Every structure is written in structure tokens, then in C-alpha cells.
Curated annotation (Swiss-Prot):
Belongs to the RNA polymerase alpha chain family. GO terms for cellular component: cytoplasm; DNA-directed RNA polymerase complex. DNA-dependent RNA polymerase catalyzes the transcription of DNA into RNA using the four ribonucleoside triphosphates as substrates. It catalyses: RNA(n) + a ribonucleoside 5'-triphosphate = RNA(n+1) + diphosphate. The gene is rpoA. SMART domains: RPOLD. Coiled coil: none annotated. It comes from Allorhizobium ampelinum (strain ATCC BAA-846 / DSM 112012 / S4) (Agrobacterium vitis (strain S4)). Residues 248-336 are annotated as: Alpha C-terminal domain (alpha-CTD). The keyword Nucleotidyltransferase applies. This is DNA-directed RNA polymerase subunit alpha. Its EC number is 2.7.7.6.
Amino acid sequence: MIQKNWQELIKPNKVEFSSSGRTKATLVAEPLERGFGLTLGNALRRVLLSSLRGAAVTAVQIDGVLHEFSSIPGVREDVTDIVLNIKEIAIKMDGDDAKRMVVRKQGPGVVTAGDIQTVGDIEILNPHHVICTLDEGAEIRMEFTVNNGKGYVPADRNRAEDAPIGLIPVDSLYSPVKKVSYKVENTREGQVLDYDKLTMTIETDGSVSGEDAVAFAARILQDQLSVFVNFDEPQREAEEEAVTELAFNPALLKKVDELELSVRSANCLKNDNIVYIGDLIQKTEAEMLRTPNFGRKSLNEIKEVLASMGLHLGMEVPAWPPENIEDLAKRYEDQY
């Protein structure tokens, strides 16, 4: 069946986020099919860095300054350095319309992003960021234009044709995600040792959490990839009927070699042709102890494992074993 191409691929049953402050987060997702750690990690990283929207300064006007190659009396930095510092201001802004912010300060002292006067829907996320340093008697006034956008926009594209003299365009780095790294390691699921474990570290400017940034990036990928799906979802009526008619606990379809028993116990079950938990729980303690090389220690180990699943030896299972046991085991593997 067509749907087996995607339905039978393993999906992560563990997706965990841990945060370190407002700007850093770590994602761990496992298990993934072999190769999917690299595929998903690289795709998410590229989208995180390039496609999420954020706010940035697009232009600045400084009183008494005509162009960025000027210097300002009493200001230690030249205008070029001031513009570079302005590019690093982290901003969160609602809405799509351009907004303006103003800063005015007298020396001596340091002008920081926290000195900027903002309107209600603009938040400065790094208020301690230094813009420039004023000497005694110096004064500066700057007016910033702020926009929302995505990706990187160079200053020449922020230069309006009707811009007034003295309006200096600024390179805009809109992305709220500043750094993304990932690594892929092997992980275990049952007796399979070569599934992928994806670990991603995301650093943002604080306008969005790392967890939300990953969610937005995944949604972008989902939307972009959907155009390539040229068929309707196959009907699963027969499978759904089989699901509702199952006469026993789906956990009985799990194979005993996934119980992580000791080697001795596992070999004894294998030699006795006990494949599924449904086979095992129908055995009595006396029957198990008659198995070659199977002792009281192995019996107690198995009883403890079964008890953790709400099962025990000597149970009766109706309609066991089902004729299509292998197909049922695959169908229900996500439920146990």
C-alpha cells in the first residue's frame, strides 16, 4: 500500500526542549529513521536562519549629520561605527507598518539602546547595548525607522528615492534567530541501535523562544512541501475496523526481544519459540520453570517486567494468536 511509505517510518516519541535564559534553547528529538537526523536538522537550520520574520532598524537620521562618513563633535565614535552599533539593536515590534523611535541625550555618558524612546508596540530587547559615547558638553539626537521583514536586506535596498538629506540607510538583519547548530548521534529503540538522535541548539534575540522558532520553521517547511503532494490520503477504513475489533491488549503484539531482558532469559524464551508477549503471558510459572536452563532468577525477572506493564503469567488471551499477527504488530507499534 502507498501509505506504508510514510506510515511505517518511525517518528520521534521524545521531543524535549530545555531553555537557558530568554535567548538560548536546546532541542532533542529521538528516535528518527537513519539519515533523517541530518535531513531534518539541516532543513530546520536553514529555515530558522533565513525565513522567520522579525524587526530591525532600516534607517537613521542624526541631527547635524549629512552622511555616514561624518564625525560628530564630542562623540567618540564616528558615524560609521554608530551605524554598526545601531544594526545590533534587538527589537520586537507588532504590526507591519514602519515605526519611528527617538533618542536624545547629553554628555558625558554612554548612549545605550535603553535610552531610546519607543512607542507602545515596540520593545527593546537588549537595553544595555552601547550605541555611542558622549564627552562633556556633547549632545546627540537620533531618529530611527523600524520595519518588520525577513532575512538580510542591505542598506542600498533600504534607501528610498525620496529620502530626505541626512537619512542614512542601515543594513537590516531581520531574523530573530542568531545562531543554530545541530548534531546527529546514534540512539536505541528496542533492539535497534542505529536510529538517529537529533540535538539542536538555537540562539535568538529574545523576541521569540527557541521552541516557538522551531515550530514556525517546521510549519514553513510543511507548507512549502505540501505543494508536491499530488494525491489524496488513501482510505484506511479496513485498518480502522481492525483496530476497533481487536480483542486483546495491543501490548501483547510487542515482541519479547524488546523487553530488554538479560541475555540468559532472552535466549531461553527464544529457544522455547516464545516470540510475542501474548505468547509469554499464557505460560504458567510451572511451564516456564520446565524450560531448559530457565531458573527462578529468570522467572522473577520476567514477572517484574510483566508487572510493570500490568500483565502476569497464566493469563488467558482470546483469539490468540491472530492470523495476521505480523501486520497487526506493525499497525499497533505506536500504541505500546
